[in-house]
Amino acid sequence: MADVMPSRTGQVSRKTNETAISVSVNVDGTGVSKIATGVGFFDHMLDQLSRHSLIDMEIKAEGDLHVDDHHTVEDTGIAIGQALAKALGDRRGITRYASIDLAMDETMTRAAVDVSGRPFLVWNVTFTSPKIGTFDTELVREFFQALAQHAGITLHVQNIYGANNHHVAETCFKSVARVLRTATEIDPRQAGRVPSTKGTLA
């Protein structure tokens, strides 16, 4: 009888004085999402993250939006990262590495990931405006910093060029989605091994 892979799902509920967030993910999904953070542009970006990674995501966040969007965006990144870490477990059998150059109209963004258990973010993205609509562009980095830290991944994101700030932000989310999709896929040639000569990813 063939080995049956355990379900790669993760659920996190996180509550502080600033936010209350619940996240569930299915790494082996089809990119179905149900997202409500109260921040419209952020919801749009998270929908892209789910759709293009094929990771099913259900996210509900209530935050102190009367202050600003910062706590909601950062804490959502923390919760998604924690849920992904739970879903991936010991990361046995995964492809581990991936990179992509992703185009959207006039914009090109590069992302590379090592699902290594070692959190690190290299961020080389510059926005020409402090806001996209009412959304602070600096929060794009804050989200990915929180995601990388709590998912235990090494993530590099570089905007190569682009004139439209919405496109720059969107290609960051889409490119990260695509590398997560590839790097977390099960490689049948790994035969269930942890993809490291150390025998562990940490």
Swiss-Prot record:
- Tagged with keyword Iron: no
| Protein's name in the database | Imidazoleglycerol-phosphate dehydratase
Q: What is its EC number?
A: 4.2.1.19
Family per UniProt?
Belongs to the imidazoleglycerol-phosphate dehydratase family.
- Name the lineage: Bacteria, Pseudomonadati, Pseudomonadota, Alphaproteobacteria, Hyphomicrobiales
Question: Which Pfam families does UniProt cross-reference here?
Answer: IGPD (PF00475)
Q: Name one GO molecular function term.
A: imidazoleglycerol-phosphate dehydratase activity
Q: What is its main location?
A: cytoplasm
Per UniProt, subcellular location reads as: Cytoplasm
Q: Name one GO cellular component term.
A: cytoplasm
List GO BP terms, alphabetically: L-histidine biosynthetic process
Q: Write out the catalysed reaction.
A: D-erythro-1-(imidazol-4-yl)glycerol 3-phosphate = 3-(imidazol-4-yl)-2-oxopropyl phosphate + H2O
Q: What class of enzyme is it?
A: lyase
Q: Does Cytoplasm count among this protein's keywords?
A: yes
Which organism is this protein's natural source?
A: Rhizobium meliloti (strain 1021) (Ensifer meliloti)
Identify the domain of life: Bacteria
Associated pathway: Amino-acid biosynthesis; L-histidine biosynthesis; L-histidine from 5-phospho-alpha-D-ribose 1-diphosphate: step 6/9
Matches recorded under InterPro entries: IGPD_sf, ImidazoleglycerolP_deHydtase, ImidazoleglycerP_deHydtase_CS, Ribosomal_Su5_D2-typ_SF
UniProt keywords, alphabetically? Amino-acid biosynthesis, Cytoplasm, Histidine biosynthesis, Lyase
